[in-house]
A protein has these predicted regions:
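N-terminal active-site segment of His-dependent metallophosphoesterases
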Residues: 1-54, 183
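C-terminal beta-strand edge segments of enzyme domains
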Residues: 3, 148, 216-338
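Conserved beta-strand and immediately adjacent loop positions that scaffold enzyme active sites
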Residues: 15, 98, 113, 145, ...
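Catalytic metal-binding/acid-base residues of hydrolase active sites
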Residues: 22, 62, 102-103, 166, ...
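Cys-nucleophile CN-hydrolase/nitrilase-fold catalytic domain and related Cys-dependent amidase chemistry
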Residues: 30-120, 124-126, 189-207
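Short beta->alpha transition motifs characteristic of CBS
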Residues: 71, 115, 126-133, 230, ...
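Active-site catalytic loop in hydrolytic enzyme cores
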Residues: 88, 105-180, 185-202, 225
Length: 338
């Protein structure tokens, strides 16, 4: 049930619109300004499309396209004109918005960042992509963790970006911190279509959490993005899915965070987000609350290592045209003169 794409708004529903944005080519500051206006105009379209829509979501790379250009002239900042325009668009149209920026980082490579702005034009969520799509993407690994906020109509909201969603731990972290709706924005192209679909559903089912997911759409003359806006209910079923590949189509649905809360409290069978930390509670009071997973202990200790680690062939971005990095995580990028 999705309220006929959100046309029939229920008392406790949250209306979501996923914009399957035409893949842009952004090379210059003028291109960036033009694409900013495209997005602003689509915020207004979303509001006209459905007066009851609470949140409009734009894909990863909505401003910058898929070139992986790290030119500082076209990188964004939180206090820059692009974010200011998005704030004004949300304020003017009385709607929450989720946007993508490639963020200037003087101490390293740019961050691939996502922001959520409320219907008053205030920045409410700021996230840096934790798992860049290596070896293809050059972005600095995110360092802010996963924030969870109170979003439209009181729903608990989290944001992850593209490749993040291929790691079950990312969706689990969102849910563990209370997220009832997890947004996943992406720039994925057609070869990832099947993996995109089943991870969106698994992230929902395994965590009793709504997932709202959208990719760029159309072609830039080199890459073909797929759209594939998907809203998955907390039981893993798909309640809205953009399969036409039509650019700038807005995929809509109503979701029910109140039913997420009800399921998390009331489900016995497959209440996996609870049962993960309470193994076998039928046999032992409260269940086993240990951490029997070797990889977790090793990761915390800085000793994460696969049995086949020494045989892995791709460990940097040279196969995709990037220089081999010489600094470690947390070390600042040295100026070229040094």
């Amino acid at each position: 049930m999705n309220g006929l794409g959100g046309l029939n708004k229920s008392e406790h529903g949250v209306g979501i619109g996923l914009v399957q944005l035409q893949l842009p080519v952004t090379v210059t500051k003028a291109d960036l300004a033009k694409q900013t206006q495209v997005i602003v105009d689509l915020v207004a379209k979303a509001r006209r499309n459905q007066p009851g829509m609470d949140l409009v979501v734009f894909p990863e790379y909505a401003l910058h396209g898929l070139s992986m250009d790290i030119n500082p002239e076209i990188m964004c900042t939180l206090d820059g004109p692009e974010v200011a325009a998005f704030k004004q668009a949300c304020r003017d149209n009385r709607i929450w918005g989720c946007f993508s920026i490639m963020e200037l980082n003087p101490g390293g490579m740019p961050y691939n960042s996502g922001i959520v702005i409320d219907d008053q034009g205030e920045l409410k969520l700021y996230y840096r992509k934790m798992h860049p799509w290596i070896p293809v993407e050059p972005w600095e690994p995110g360092d802010l963790g996963i924030p969870v906020i109170e979003g439209p109509r009181g729903a608990k909201l989290a944001l992850i970006i593209c490749h993040d969603g291929m790691f079950p731990e990312m969706a689990r972290e969102c849910a563990y911190k209370g997220a009832e709706i997890m947004i996943r924005t992406a720039g994925y192209t057609a070869p990832i279509r099947d993996a995109w679909r089943f991870t969106n559903q698994a992230n929902a089912f395994c965590n009793l959490m709504v997932t709202a997911n959208v990719c760029m759409c159309g072609s830039d003359g080199t890459f073909d993005s797929m759209g594939e806006g998907m809203i998955c209910n907390f039981d893993g079923t798909i309640i809205a899915h953009g399969t036409s590949g039509r650019v700038n189509e807005i995929i809509t649905a109503e979701v029910r965070p109140d039913l997420v809360r009800e399921a998390r409290l009331g489900w016995g069978v497959e209440n996996n987000i609870y049962q993960f930390g309470h193994r076998g509670y039928v046999a032992v009071a409260g269940g086993a609350q240990d951490a029997p997973y070797t990889y977790m202990h090793d990761l915390v200790a800085g000793k994460y290592r696969l049995p086949w680690e020494d045989e892995i062939k791709v460990k940097d971005g040279t196969s995709c045209g990037f220089d081999k990095p010489m600094r470690r995580y947390g070390e600042p990028l040295k100026p070229a003169a040094e």
